Amino acid sequence: MRLPFLPLIALASLVAFSVTAEERMDAESFERYTTGQTLRFSAEGVPYGMEQYLPGRRVLWAFLGDQCQEGIWYERDELICFVYDDNPVEQCWSFYRGENGLRAVFEGGDGPGTELYEVERSSDPLSCSAPEVGV
């Protein structure tokens, strides 16, 4: 019995793999991609937040509509980890670079969690809201 569609199925699988192939990023590739950029992220298609990547592995993060938080990032155990001034608890992520930008997977104590997707990349600085004034 001859399977005439087998080569087509193999080709379709190869094309699907190449379209969805992502490269896991180490600290050096992450730094090259992000430094001097502001990235906007979404989770499950919903706007999530923005982060500006500054020289020296410094960052400014803001959930949409929230105040900016200053922080730093570093590599630990092949993960990209962040610590912010307002929240000193380490937050580690796996970052993958694909044709449509970055995908970030939160790597908490319970295993992989939240996935964020880059939806915009700009060299414009992050616009931070001022803290509440007066009481």
Predicted regions and their residues:
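Positively charged n-region of N-terminal signal peptides that target proteins for export
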Residues: 1-4
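Bacterial N-terminal signal peptides
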Residues: 7-16
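Lipid interaction determinants
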Residues: 17-70, 79-135
